[in-house]
Each structure stands twice: as structure tokens, then as C-alpha cells.
């Protein structure tokens, strides 16, 4: 390899399962449930790394070995070639995972989805309250002869 190319093979690998609060430790979660987030994806993790000013690369074609249905992973550079930290606030893999798990719930795409879901839930409630109540009783059934 010449000096112009970047070797991402030495970067830290983060699978979304590592910070997923829905998974158990046996299924691959690496941080505590209280510090993890719900169902993160590779794009959100990569955006959080950019926010932390860490270079990252998304590998969509890779799958998590324990559960091959979990597709995608992110490679993140924590240290330079000489061993110095790129972001002094993040010193280890575990600390990086905790920081990413803090940022994922505040990701703009996730916030938009949550607002859309809230609007959908409020819309049917408004329509049901304006419509009249039904006079039919709830208990029916087959009549005996």
C-alpha cells in the first residue's frame, strides 16, 4: 500500500447490535441497557461518528456473525497511525459505543420519524372523538333454542 491510501482494516468495527437495547448480552450487546439505544442502524451510527469528528466507513455488505440477518457495520478510526487519539474525549471502544448510543436517539431522521408517529396517533383519536357513539351492545353471540 502506498502512503496515499487509507487502511481501514485497523479501524474499530461497530455493529448496530453492540448498542441495541432490544438485544441481550448473549445476542451481542456490549454496553448496559440503560446506556444503549433502541434499534440503531449503520447510517445513524456513521452520522454520530461524523458529529464526534471521527472518520468512519459504512460497510453495508457485511453481516453480524451471530445473526446474519443483521446486515451492515461501521468502521471508525479512533487513533492515528502514530497512536495518538483523534478525539481526546473518546479513549476506548466502549466509550465510543456509549457516546454513539447517547447521540442516536437525537439523530434528525429518528426525531422526524417519532414526530410523524405522534401525529398519526393523534389524528385517529381526533376522528373517533368527533364521531357518534354506537348504540350496539358489545356482547352478542349465538342464541340458544
Swiss-Prot record:
Top-level taxon of the source organism: Eukaryota
Protein family: Belongs to the SRP19 family.
Region (Disordered) residue spans: 104-145
GO molecular function: 7S RNA binding
Pfam families: SRP19
GO annotation, biological process: SRP-dependent cotranslational protein targeting to membrane
Record protein name field: Signal recognition particle 19 kDa protein
Function: Component of the signal recognition particle (SRP) complex, a ribonucleoprotein complex that mediates the cotranslational targeting of secretory and membrane proteins to the endoplasmic reticulum (ER). Binds directly to 7SL RNA. Mediates binding of SRP54 to the SRP complex.
Residues that bear N-acetylmethionine: 1
Segments of skewed composition (Low complexity): 124-137
Taxonomic lineage from the root: Eukaryota, Viridiplantae, Streptophyta, Embryophyta, Tracheophyta
Subcellular location: Cytoplasm; Nucleus, Nucleolus
InterPro entries linked: Signal_recog_particle_SRP19, SRP19-like_sf
Alphabetical UniProt keywords: Acetylation, Cytoplasm, Nucleus, Ribonucleoprotein, RNA-binding, Signal recognition particle
Biased composition annotated in UniProt, kind: Basic and acidic residues: 104-123
Gene Ontology CC, one term: nucleus
Record text on subunit structure and interactions: Component of a signal recognition particle complex that consists of a 7SL RNA molecule of 300 nucleotides and six protein subunits: SRP72, SRP68, SRP54, SRP19, SRP14 and SRP9.
Amino acid at each position: 500500500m502506498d502512503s496515499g491510501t487509507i487502511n481501514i482494516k485497523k479501524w474499530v468495527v461497530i455493529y448496530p447490535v453492540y448498542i441495541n437495547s432490544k438485544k441481550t448480552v448473549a445476542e451481542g450487546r456490549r454496553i448496559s441497557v440503560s446506556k444503549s439505544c433502541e434499534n440503531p442502524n449503520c447510517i445513524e451510527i456513521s452520522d454520530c461518528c461524523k458529529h464526534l469528528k471521527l472518520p468512519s466507513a459504512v460497510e453495508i455488505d457485511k453481516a453480524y456473525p451471530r445473526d446474519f440477518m443483521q446486515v451492515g457495520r461501521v468502521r471508525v478510526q479512533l487513533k492515528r497511525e502514530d497512536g495518538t487519539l483523534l478525539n481526546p474525549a473518546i479513549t476506548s471502544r466502549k466509550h465510543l459505543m456509549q457516546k454513539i448510543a447517547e447521540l442516536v436517539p437525537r439523530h434528525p431522521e429518528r426525531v422526524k420519524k417519532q414526530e410523524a408517529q405522534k401525529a398519526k396517533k393523534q389524528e385517529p383519536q381526533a376522528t373517533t372523538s368527533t364521531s357518534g357513539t354506537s348504540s350496539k351492545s358489545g356482547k352478542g353471540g349465538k342464541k340458544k333454542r
